[in-house]
Amino acid sequence: MNYQVLLYYKYMTIDDPEQFAQDHLAFCKAHHLKGRILVSTEGINGTLSGTKEETEQYMAHMHADERFKDMVFKIDEAEGHAFKKMHVRPRKEIVALDLEDDVDPRHTTGQYLSPVEFRKALEDDDTVIIDARNDYEFDLGHFRGAIRPNITRFRDLPDWIKENKALFADKKVVTYCTGGIRCEKFSGWLLKEGFEDVAQLHGGIATYGKDPETKSEYWDGKMYVFDDRISVDINQVEKTIIGKDWFDGKPCERYINCANPECNKQILVSEENETKYLGACSYECAKHERNRYVQANNISDNEWQQRLTNFDDLHQHA
């Protein structure tokens, strides 16, 4: 495989995010890179793909900048680009928590745990493990025994914690996410909220999955990623499928977006059921006039109506 996917972030000061984004985009395009990078006054958060030569040049370029000289890159081999385009965008935050009183992880964040230390936390009955990702990420793969917050956006996590605070009373709290960036801010927020013993998996699931000592122990399923790959394997020793098909509950790791553009819900579904249910999550979405699956597959009105009857068995409409 001649391509690499880079995942990285750093909380630091960027004085002029707009100018930085403009210059950085030009550099990335000149090196034929594709991906998504967010920059703000609080730092940089990026994931991009390119050939090994191009991504190595990018990392060397970043490390030559005093501001990014110690930035850690998580690297995955790939068969091709993981993105279709290259975007570098200035933002208010590099990860959106939307707090009234923002948290600066450079000053307030949970204790960092190495993969080995995190594995010990997983084995400790007095430690609560909180998955700081969205529910659809959790449903594809997670650490055994972790708590699944019922959220679809990171910014909703603080409210969910407040509503379920009784679950964590007098416990040590350890949190984890994909690459570590969400936990940096989230664990700092937990400390501000009065949780006294807070820690985080340093480098996230991506780092744990490559650790030679832990060998991905206690991880089940796949890790969701925000690029064209959708998911990657983490546990190289014991592979399990924990995802369940939206319609029949059978083991499934295939994500699609609901074909109704006004819904766009992510669901796990087999190719067979995607065909059967017109790429939609519900009867209402399947019959929507702008159903993308119907349009893309040139399905006739008669066939459309026929497949809608498949929902009768699901009792999803009156």
UniProtKB/Swiss-Prot annotation:
Keyword Nuclease attributed: no
The reaction(s) this protein catalyses: uridine(34) in tRNA + AH2 + O2 = 5-hydroxyuridine(34) in tRNA + A + H2O
Domain Rhodanese: 123-217
Keywords from the named record: Oxidoreductase, tRNA processing
Active-site residue list: 177
GO BP term (any one): tRNA modification
SUPFAM superfamilies, per the entry: Rhodanese/Cell cycle control phosphatase
Gene3D superfamilies reported for this sequence: 3.30.70.100, Rhodanese-like domain
One GO MF term: oxidoreductase activity, acting on paired donors, with incorporation or reduction of molecular oxygen
EC number: 1.14.-.-
Enzyme class: oxidoreductase
Function (record text): Catalyzes oxygen-dependent 5-hydroxyuridine (ho5U) modification at position 34 in tRNAs.
PANTHER family: RHODANESE-LIKE DOMAIN-CONTAINING PROTEIN 7-RELATED, THIOSULFATE SULFURTRANSFERASE/RHODANESE-LIKE DOMAIN-CONTAINING PROTEIN 2
Similarity annotation: Belongs to the TrhO family.
Protein name from the UniProt record: tRNA uridine(34) hydroxylase
Phylogenetic lineage: Bacteria, Bacillati, Bacillota, Bacilli, Bacillales
